[in-house]
Amino acid sequence: MEKMEEKKRIVLVPVPAQRHVTPMMQLGTALNMKGFSITVVEGQFNKVSSSQNFPGFQFVTIPDTESLPESVLERLGPVEFLFEINKTSEASFKDCIRQSLLQQGNDIACIIYDEYMYFCGAAAKEFNLPSVIFSTQSATNQVSRCVLRKLSAEKFLVDMEDPEVQETLVENLHPLRYKDLPTSGVGPLDRLFELCREIVNKRTASAVIINTVRCLESSSLKRLQHELGIPVYALGPLHITVSAASSLLEEDRSCVEWLNKQKPRSVVYISLGSVVQMETKEVLEMARGLFNSNQPFLWVIRPGSIAGSEWIESLPEEVIKMVSERGYIVKWAPQIEVLGHPAVGGFWSHCGWNSTLESIVEGVPMICRPFHGEQKLNALCLESIWRIGFQVQGKVERGGVERAVKRLIVDEEGADMRERALVLKENLKASVRNGGSSYNALEEIVNLM
């Protein structure tokens, strides 16, 4: 590593996934603007586009991670993949920090690591370096992990066979019920609960930073600080604190030109994130329902997101023609710009936390189609607490798709949701202005370091 300027350096360790890398790089940009140099430690298989988007950052690759190619995620599943990363990366990360300290002197102000990269805690302890945990998910999701870590997987499975237990409210997490806890779609429960215990273990960390906003999750933030016993800083929405291009996927900006030709608040934007896969039959039902709604739509279909297909070549030609009459399909969109476009009236989303925050910041109400884990928690909050969206559950069929789009874009109920979303939009934007809760939290973090 080259000798850097005489200013304190922060080491960032993100999870190798779009939804984690994006807010971590936004955090790095915010701290860089406060005078810190930024070093990003990444694996061989999760390269961030450093030369293009972050020329002022230093990027270091952990050695010996070639044994964990991306295909391992598909084979192991998310929980076991994270265990494997933490097992194989601890020693090489320590070597990385040791080499850095030898070459550049004791200029590391702090190691900030994604909550899933908890192997960093051992290096922070060994070299007596301050560390801070960063969560890219909601505070409510964090609190739910505090609940799960105290449970027995075997007993939980038995208890959840009782419908009454399923509907029981989780203490201090209203309206969350036990059946809403993020346990689905991630593999065996015993390993999930073990991972929750590792994540919630603060080790030697002096604080937790969360990409959320106090006005959205004040009760969960208070509960989390009580559970962890260290300061919890709500620093979001990070994407409006800074403007940092950090997408790992190439964005198709042609859709903005298409949006320019549409009427205000008429378009439904559909994007189910960077991971979700759908069956061809579901995509066909979705396409017909969108067409029948008589509303223009912008639809993100990632390559590989239709099971068994490279992209949309498996769809019948008449469906492609039908979609092109009323809609526009891209492989990936500049989502923040799309949501802020005056033509967009609603967002059909998987309810990942980044997408949820980005939609609220633009005052766009949502159709919630969560698939697993924390997405279901976010959808519950959108529907039952903030009341700026509604869930569509069960089998995807054209009639349900058509009704959902009309409910959001055309009906009075959708207009009411939009009004509430616009109020939240102003609250979130106020949080990052001088004197706002997130603005003040960033100042406190800088002083902490």
Curated annotation (Swiss-Prot):
Gene3D superfamilies on file: Glycogen Phosphorylase B (3.40.50.2000)
SUPFAM superfamilies: UDP-Glycosyltransferase/glycogen phosphorylase
Binding site for UDP-alpha-D-glucose: 274, 333-335, 350-358, 372-375
Pfam families to which the protein is assigned, alphabetical: UDPGT (PF00201)
GO molecular function, one term: UDP-glycosyltransferase activity
Main EC class the enzyme belongs to: transferase
Keyword Ribosomal protein: no
Enzyme Commission designation: 2.4.1.-
InterPro entries, per database record: UDP_glucos_trans
UniProt superkingdom: Eukaryota
Keyword field contains Cytoplasm: no
The entry's keywords: Glycosyltransferase, Transferase
Record family assignment: Belongs to the UDP-glycosyltransferase family.
Official protein name in the record: UDP-glycosyltransferase 76E6
Natural source organism: Arabidopsis thaliana (Mouse-ear cress)
